[in-house]
């Protein structure tokens, strides 16, 4: 089986018949996902899985204006509500921007990136896009490995958007684990 990113599957809106009704608000809310999860649990935490230079997937590189194979800063985390992983998040930043516009990206540790993004009024967000990721997608496998030992369904819904600050962009992708639906609405 060939594992690849699904550049062609990112949609402006989640298709109504395919997306579970309880998941739709999570996919479409333009506000802070961190704040939304925090408001629905007693204990919120961020489990940092990776923060390093890496080659983004081709569709991610294209969104950020990077050449194929060019290194970028990668941060992968699990958002955890009351001890249960609910979201696998992946952030990509052109490596030359980590010292400039996006200095906040350095030294985040286990602090949520979302809290920093939505606290700064200078940071703008482009519209959300969503996709149904299946086992052919590398992001599905990263989310699955991070959520182990839980078994995941054959497909996971995700959303992503670009954040802008002083002409520089940051890509944030969020893959929703089935446990997100266990949080109160």
From Swiss-Prot:
Where in the cell is the protein located?
Answer: Cytoplasm
- Which InterPro entries does UniProt cross-reference here? Chorismate--pyruvate_lyase (IPR007440), Chorismate_lyase_/UTRA_dom_sf (IPR028978)
Top-level class of the enzyme under EC nomenclature? lyase
- Give the E.C. number(s): 4.1.3.40
**BP-aspect Gene Ontology terms:** pyruvate biosynthetic process; ubiquinone biosynthetic process
Positions contributing to substrate binding: 75, 113, 174
Chief localisation class: cytoplasm
Reactions this protein catalyses: chorismate = 4-hydroxybenzoate + pyruvate
GO function term, MF aspect, one: chorismate lyase activity
Task: Report the Pfam families cross-referenced here.
Answer: Chor_lyase
Keywords, ordered alphabetically: Cytoplasm, Lyase, Pyruvate, Ubiquinone biosynthesis
Pathway note: Cofactor biosynthesis; ubiquinone biosynthesis
Its biological function?
Answer: Removes the pyruvyl group from chorismate, with concomitant aromatization of the ring, to provide 4-hydroxybenzoate (4HB) for the ubiquinone pathway.
The entry assigns this protein to a family as follows: Belongs to the UbiC family.
State the name under which the record lists this protein: Probable chorismate pyruvate-lyase
Species of the source: Aromatoleum aromaticum (strain DSM 19018 / LMG 30748 / EbN1)
The beginning of the lineage is: Bacteria, Pseudomonadati, Pseudomonadota, Betaproteobacteria, Rhodocyclales
Identify the gene encoding this protein: ubiC
């Amino acid at each position: 089986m060939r594992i690849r990113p699904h550049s062609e599957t990112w949609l402006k809106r989640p298709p109504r018949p395919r997306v579970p009704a309880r998941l739709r608000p999570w996919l479409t809310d333009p506000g802070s996902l961190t704040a939304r999860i925090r408001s629905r649990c007693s204990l919120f935490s961020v489990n940092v899985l990776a923060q390093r230079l890496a080659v983004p997937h081709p569709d991610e590189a294209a969104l950020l204006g990077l050449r194929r194979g060019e290194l970028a800063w990668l941060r992968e985390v699990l958002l955890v509500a009351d001890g249960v992983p609910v979201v696998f998040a992946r952030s990509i930043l052109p490596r030359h921007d980590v010292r400039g516009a996006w200095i906040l990206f350095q030294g985040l540790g286990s602090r949520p990136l979302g809290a920093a993004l939505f606290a700064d009024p200078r940071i703008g967000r482009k519209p959300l896009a969503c996709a149904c990721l299946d086992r052919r997608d590398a992001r599905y496998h990263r989310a699955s490995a991070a959520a182990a030992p839980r078994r995941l369904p054959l497909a996971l819904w995700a959303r992503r958007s670009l954040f802008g600050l002083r002409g520089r962009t940051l890509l944030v992708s969020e893959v929703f684990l089935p446990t997100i639906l266990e949080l109160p609405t």
